[in-house]
Amino acid sequence: MSKVIRVRYEKGVLKPLEPVNLEDGEEVDIIIRENLAELARRIRRRLSQEREEPSEILSRERSRLA
């Protein structure tokens, strides 16, 4: 079963923001995806501050997320 849930990271622990149907000790794979709105804000800020080419900023962001 695959399901997307929102979690909050606090003090080294990912805490679900909604009920999760898992048994104690069950293991799952987690994919951490950056918030798209936050990524767009960061890129806009860099464009206005650093005078870099958009392609340079996108390249750096891609490598940071890889």
UniProtKB/Swiss-Prot annotation:
Record carries keyword Disulfide bond: no
Q: What does this protein do?
A: Possibly the antitoxin component of a type II toxin-antitoxin (TA) system.
Matches recorded under SUPFAM superfamilies: AF2212/PG0164-like
User: What keywords were assigned to this record?
Assistant: Toxin-antitoxin system
Protein name, please?
A: Putative antitoxin APE_0279a.1
Family according to the record? Belongs to the UPF0165 family.
Organism expressing this protein natively: Aeropyrum pernix (strain ATCC 700893 / DSM 11879 / JCM 9820 / NBRC 100138 / K1)
Lineage top rank: taxon: Archaea
Per the record's keyword annotation, is NADP included, yes or no?
A: no
Output the InterPro entries linked to this UniProt entry: AF2212-like, AF2212-like_dom_sf
